[in-house]
């Protein structure tokens, strides 16, 4: 989305009262991952863990994670807002409170959460508030949505490390929200693994040039 055409009100979060009402029935999505063939929906193997990340356009964000060894499956969707079972158009309206996010299901014995955090921080600019590059709106905000206290602690610690690195490079304060994961709503089938289906598709995702330690 061009900033020239973006409406400023899309950068303002709705309240639970003003958000769209949504629907009781989930929207239709894909059954399997287009790249790996793994089932998108749970239940997942018991040795897997999961986290949800928001870092701008979810097409490019998802590709960053499905390429990592140790990641079992990824899916794009909507979370951290109010509207149940939203559509893409509703999320883009700015009236759901949801973020465009990536669900990452991973094997912690093969890839660490610290590694996932490093990819997250390196792949976008977490200081831009309700936007990412030319994409303006609450659905493009930076966020880490955690499923355990351990994930929360690691995310907060990494945020401090990254803030120091960004400050040294002249960037402002990190605006990333780190909160307990809310319900994840799968996006439409069209959006799942979009850049694998459309290799020339556009997604304005860019980092700051930092390299985050993940040891």
Swiss-Prot record:
InterPro entries: Met_Sox_Rdtase_MsrA_dom, Met_Sox_Rdtase_MsrA_sf, MsrA_MetSO_reductase. One of its GO terms (cellular component) is cytoplasm. It comes from Saccharophagus degradans (strain 2-40 / ATCC 43961 / DSM 17024). The gene is msrA. It comes from the Bacteria. Belongs to the MsrA Met sulfoxide reductase family. One of its GO terms (biological process) is protein modification process. Gene3D superfamilies: Peptide methionine sulphoxide reductase MsrA. This is Peptide methionine sulfoxide reductase MsrA. One of its GO terms (molecular function) is L-methionine-(S)-S-oxide reductase activity. The active site is at 57. It catalyses: L-methionyl-[protein] + [thioredoxin]-disulfide + H2O = L-methionyl-(S)-S-oxide-[protein] + [thioredoxin]-dithiol; [thioredoxin]-disulfide + L-methionine + H2O = L-methionine (S)-S-oxide + [thioredoxin]-dithiol.
